[in-house]
């Protein structure tokens, strides 16, 4: 199977399983960011592509637990690393590259320590997706459907934490440059929200 064929198969799988539907957009945006971040670097783009398209499968409704208490301790990364090999084999993805894909998925979160170039690129891209207008949109979209917060105040606290901690986690200089306008946009939004709502945000 050609490169284009297994990529299309992976995209189709995620398009079919993305629930809520708005979660689908994270994958193509994330991959586009990896291409910007990775420009001039030597890395396996197939590995990055497969990892960024599959990395959040475990947060989709239908893949994550329904019970709220179980969801609070749900390890979506462990779920994906278990499921991804069979999905990739079904898509005729090169089997020799699957371990590298799993390594990217295992270390894609801000608190993780990536050890490969592919993982570092993907992790930086995922951090950027949590900043700026997109980061705001994704955070607010979780209200009422995520166990981490249910009120606007809790969402505001999440945005404040993202602003404070995430930019410091970026490793690649291109990522840091791309973060500058995103940080400014998010900071402006947070300040406006605090000003407009005052003590009555709820």
Residue ranges of predicted features:
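Inter-helical turn/loop segments and adjacent helix faces that build the functional surface
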Residues: 91-95
């Amino acid at each position: 199977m050609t490169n284009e064929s297994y990529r299309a198969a992976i995209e189709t799988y995620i398009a079919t399983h993305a629930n809520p539907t708005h979660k689908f957009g994270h994958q193509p945006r994330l991959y586009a960011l990896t291409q910007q971040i990775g420009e001039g670097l030597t890395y396996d783009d197939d590995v990055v592509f497969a990892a960024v398209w599959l990395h959040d499968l475990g947060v989709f409704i239908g893949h994550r637990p329904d019970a709220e208490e179980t969801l609070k301790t749900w390890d979506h990364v462990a779920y994906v690393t278990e499921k991804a090999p069979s999905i990739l084999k079904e898509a005729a993805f090169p089997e020799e590259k699957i371990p590298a894909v799993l390594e990217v998925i295992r270390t894609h979160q801000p608190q993780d320590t990536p050890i490969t170039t592919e993982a570092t690129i993907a992790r930086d891209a995922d951090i950027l997706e949590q900043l700026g207008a997109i980061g705001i949109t994704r955070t607010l979209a979780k209200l009422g459907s995520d166990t981490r917060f249910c009120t606007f105040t809790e969402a505001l606290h999440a945005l404040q934490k993202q602003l404070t901690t995430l930019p410091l986690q970026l490793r690649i200089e291109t990522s840091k440059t791309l973060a500058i306008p995103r940080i400014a946009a998010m900071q402006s939004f947070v300040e406006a929200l605090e000003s407009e709502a005052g003590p009555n945000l709820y």
